[in-house]
Regions:
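A short acidic, Gly/Pro-enriched loop at the edge of an enzyme's catalytic core
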Residues: 147-160
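Conserved SAM-binding loop of SAM-dependent methyltransferases across substrates and taxa
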Residues: 82-95, 111-112
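Conserved beta-strand signature within the Rossmann-like core of class I S-adenosyl-L-methionine
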Residues: 186-195
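Class I SAM-dependent methyltransferase Rossmann-like catalytic core
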Residues: 2-71
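A short glycine-rich, Lys/Arg-flanked "PGG" loop and its adjoining helix->strand segment in the class I
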Residues: 173-185
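S-adenosyl-L-methionine
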Residues: 115-150
Length: 229
């Protein structure tokens, strides 16, 4: 896997569970800003982080691929970070195209938790593009959209993926009007939430495929189909 130090830094911001115990202790003592500006810049092993990240994405793929058929599908990814999962999907399926919606900045003080309006961000879209291309995803197979540019995809999607992002860190309603434009009759969306029952009001079908009781959120991963307009 191609990964440089800048990309490894992004991975640690997006998936902080990959930070080793020693570095976690440093972050706890000196704070996130010091950790982001200095520790993650000089005291990390990009290769090791890349391998752990790839392993994590493979695990995620194994879970969702049991419930979703990606072949010949248009896939929308929201809040997917570096998009390692999309790489794994592409290696195992014949995808039509990925559309990726992400933010293009790193918050000055990264805060993890709930954010109603989706203001928090920790990404750099030029690095996402570099990561995908250098790891074998052809440029014509994906398009990246900056959430804050207000220019979002205007086509229908078969599958929408938003793991540990939509309704996990910010309100689902941020995207609701947009979804009503891009959902087809048989479109499916997969995401993590603590309020699975709520979505029976928005979709014809809501299926819980896994539960994560080991996190603060105690979230459930659900697949929804048939948006109610």
């Amino acid at each position: 896997m191609f990964i440089n130090r800048e990309i490894a830094q992004l991975i640690l911001l997006q998936r902080n569970e990959l930070t080793n115990p020693s570095l976690q202790k440093i972050r706890k003592i000196f704070g996130r800003r010091f950790f982001t500006k200095f520790v993650s810049k000089y005291l990390i092993s990009p290769k090791s982080i890349g391998n752990e990240y790839l392993s994590l994405m493979k695990d995620e793929y194994e879970i969702i691929s049991k419930f979703l058929d990606f072949d010949k599908k248009n896939v929308l990814s929201i809040g997917s970070g570096l998009c390692g999962l999309e790489l794994i999907i592409d290696r195992n399926h014949s995808i039509k195209k990925f559309s990726i919606i992400e933010k293009n900045y790193v918050s000055k003080k990264v805060v993890y938790g709930w954010d109603n309006k989706n203001y928090e961000a920790y990404n750099k879209l030029s690095l996402v593009e570099s990561f995908l291309i250098n790891n074998g995803l052809k440029k014509e197979k994906f398009e990246i959209f900056d959430f804050d540019s207000k220019k979002l995809p205007d086509k229908d999607f078969d599958i929408i993926i938003s793991l540990y992002s939509l309704d996990y860190h910010y309100d689902f309603d941020v995207y609701l009007d947009f979804f009503k434009k891009v959902f087809k009759k048989n479109s499916k969306i997969i995401f993590d939430t603590i309020r699975a029952d709520y979505f029976t009001n928005l979709f014809d079908s809501v299926k819980i495929i896994s539960s994560n009781e080991n996190t603060v959120h105690k979230s459930k991963r659900i697949i929804c189909e048939g948006i109610k307009l």
